[in-house]
Regions:
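Residues that define the transmembrane beta-barrel architecture of outer-membrane proteins
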Residues: 1, 65-69, 111-115, 163-167
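Gram-negative outer-membrane beta-barrel transporters
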Residues: 1-100
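Short, glycine/charged-rich beta-strand-loop motifs at protein surfaces that mediate ligand recognition
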Residues: 102-108, 116-120
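Outer-membrane beta-barrel pore domains
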Residues: 57, 111, 173-175
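C-terminal beta-signal and adjacent terminal beta-strands/loops
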Residues: 91-101, 120-175
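Feature captures outer-membrane beta-barrel proteins of Gram-negative bacteria and organelles
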Residues: 69-71, 75, 117-119, 169
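Juxtamembrane/interface motifs at transmembrane-helix termini
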Residues: 36-37, 107, 149-151
Length: 175
């Protein structure tokens, strides 16, 4: 299910709303990429020729949220010195796994929320000055980490899939 709406609510102002409901599950998937009994303990292998093969049938696909929503507002205000452009967006995703394994606190996030905003003055002489904040809700820099399980030979890691909060000023001049 996808819903996309854009509304012009005033001179130079638009509101965008996007919503998706995604029911992405494996019909059949025998994961024989490793011996999964090291992670899950004893179970019946889905492939008799591959010890520790694990059936993911009916499981949700990784990196696919169940619900996704984006709300954004943009405004352009012409002035004597140039345009002032203001933008803000909020993104919400629910029940998202960052891998095939859904482990609470490691590879599964109940929600991922992102807030971005910026204000830009685009001067008539080709210079622009922009103040911005991206991923402003991630104060602890901990959004969307995932765990890679160690193999029998060792390894394992944490991976971050989204950048942390960034804020700053940017000046651009076009020659």
């Amino acid at each position: 299910l996808d819903l996309n709406m854009t509304a012009r609510v005033g001179m130079g102002t638009t509101i965008n709303f996007d919503y998706s409901y995604i029911d992405a599950q494996y019909d059949s998937y025998c994961d024989d990429s490793r011996d999964w009994s090291e992670v899950h303990g004893t179970f019946t292998a889905c492939n008799p020729n591959s010890a520790g093969s694990y059936s993911r049938a009916g499981g949700s696909m990784p990196w696919t949220p169940e619900q996704s929503m984006i709300l954004s507002v943009n405004h352009v205000q012409p002035t004597n010195i140039g345009d002032v452009v203001i933008g803000a967006s909020y993104s919400y995703k629910s029940d998202i796994a960052l891998g095939d394994e859904r482990v609470e606190g490691l590879t599964f996030n109940d929600t991922i929320e992102r807030l971005n905003f910026s204000t830009t003055i685009e001067f008539n002489n080709g210079t622009s000055l922009r103040g911005f904040c991206t991923n402003c809700l991630d104060e602890k820099d901990d959004i969307a980490f995932s765990l890679i399980y160690p193999q029998s030979q060792g390894g394992g890691a944490r991976i971050k899939y989204y950048p942390g909060m960034r804020a700053g000023l940017e000046v651009i001049h076009k020659f």
